[in-house]
Amino acid sequence: MRKLILLLLFIVPFFSWGQLDSSKKYSVNTIAFYNVENLFDTINDPKTFDDDRTPKGKDKWSSIIYKKKIKNIAKVISEIGREISNSGPSIIGLSEVENKNVLIDLIKSEKLKKESYGIAHYDSPDER
């Protein structure tokens, strides 16, 4: 019995040793995915299926509508994860984006420009 007690007194401190270092600091980062539902610019591109979202298209897609959509999406993205972090998401995946130019407009918007986001973009055909 005495040997068991001595053994426990010797082993237990090693198991709790790692828990003594309370100086470790952790940061929380947010990763998000957002379907922005047809983020198109107003320029008609014959290589894409954007005819509805042009000034002459069925949706009468204007610069005013485009800028408002950019502003609204930027606001939502900037608020993702704010309850647990002091910044917006570290990584964001977006779908239904027409081209790289709309992503550039989005990250240059008032709500997102301070985050210094970069862009990794791939064009893929969408033949709806």
Where are these regions (language model features)?
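Short, solvent-exposed loop/turn segments at the edges of secondary structure
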Residues: 4, 127-128
